[in-house]
Amino acid sequence: MRILFLTDNFPPEVNAPASRTFEHCREWVKAGHQVTVITGAPNFPTGKVFPGYRNRLWQRETLDGIQVVRVWTYITANTEVAKRTLDFLSFMVFGFLAGLVQRRPDVIIGTSPQFFTNCAAWMLSVFRWRPFIFELRDLWPESIKTVGAMRDSVALRLMERLERFLYRRSAAVVAVTESFRRNLIARGINGDQIVVITNGVDLSRFQPMPRDPELAEQLRLTGKFVAGYIGTH
């Protein structure tokens, strides 16, 4: 199968979308699929392009068998909403154009946030006559409103309408939590269209370690049951 994946972030960037996308694509390559990722020059979160890269109109490289196409975007730090929106829109445009000249895929995947990436993926699915899958890692723009980055406005309501449009136009929505699935169903999205695939872990890299008595003593945890949680969901 030929898979075309659009993502705003990809290694060497280190964040949730970059890691999740890379690990999934790497496993698909191991399974014998041909994977092409369209992304931008690595710059997150500072807005400065990583050493060894340039913000060019077109760059190609191969990472662990994944064909990576990097396109020009309006680069800015992860701070001002207006500038970040320009960044998102520029990737939507140039990511779409890059997708038009790739070998025709069997499936097109866009990951969100931000969902302008999925706008490009949906448009490509229309022009290339291929199914579009919406990967939902966070509820956007709801999360923007929740953290106070945007107030309720005409612009926000238009974004919410676009969000629902993309859900309905996708062949499937892949959500990372059951709560996201319930949220979409409550908003009128067909539950049969939604698949939950939670974030996983590479057990070849992460294994339980034997208890460290000296560390437990230092932290005054000797004889106590200790549980830790790392994550946002």
Predicted feature residues:
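Membrane-proximal helix-turn-helix segments that form the acceptor-binding/catalytic region
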Residues: 31, 96-100, 116-119, 123-127, ...
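N-terminal subdomain of nucleotide-sugar transferases
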Residues: 1-64
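Conserved donor-binding/catalytic core segment of Leloir-type glycosyltransferases
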Residues: 220-233
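Carbohydrate-associated surface elements
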Residues: 179, 200
